[in-house]
Amino acid sequence: MSKQTEETEMSSLTEEIQILKKEKQAMILAHYYVPDEVQEIADVTGDSFYLSKVAKEADAKILVFAGVSFMGESAKILNPEKKVLLPDPAADCAMAHMADVEKIRAMRDRYPDLAVVCYINSTAKLKQYADVCVTSANAVKVVKALPNKHIYFIPDQHLGSFVAAQVPEKEVIVGDGYCPVHHQITAEEVRQAK
C-alpha cells in the first residue's frame, strides 16, 4: 500500500470517527501510551488519573477509553450512568493484578489499625478492598494524613518504597507488584539516555 493510499484511508477513517462521535455523543480519551494515530483523533490525551477526572466532568454519553482495562473500570466507577467502551478489552496492565485479596485480609488480621492504600493503577476488584486510592502525585500526602500507623501499600513496590522513605513515622508495608516494562530498565540505560 502506498503512503498516499494509507493517508487517504486514514483521513477517511478519521472523518467517519468524527461523524460517529457527534451522532453518538461520544468522547475519546487516550492514554499517553497508545499509538500516535489514536492520540491524534482523541478528544483528550493524558495519564490515567487525568483522564478519569476529565471523564467525570464530560457531557458525553459514551466514553471511549483508549488505554488498559483498569482505566476503563475507573471511568465506569466514576460514571455509572455513562457507557464506557474499551476498544481493546485485552489491553491490560500486569501490575494491576499483582496484589492478592487474601493477603490484604491476612494483613488486616495481623495489624488491626492497618490502612490499605491502593495505587490507582489497579483493578476495580482490588480497589474495593482498599481504604483509599492514591496517585503517584498525591501518595505521600495521603499516607501522611492517615491516622493509621500501619500502612499496606499495594500493588506498586517502587512507589510504595518511595512513600515509605518519605513517611518514616509510619510503618509502610510494601506490596511486591511492579511494572514489568519499567522493571527491565537499568541504571546504565538511564545514564545513556541523559
Task: Describe the function of each predicted region.
Residues 2-194:
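Active-site loop-to-helix "anion-binding N-cap" substructures in soluble metabolic enzymes
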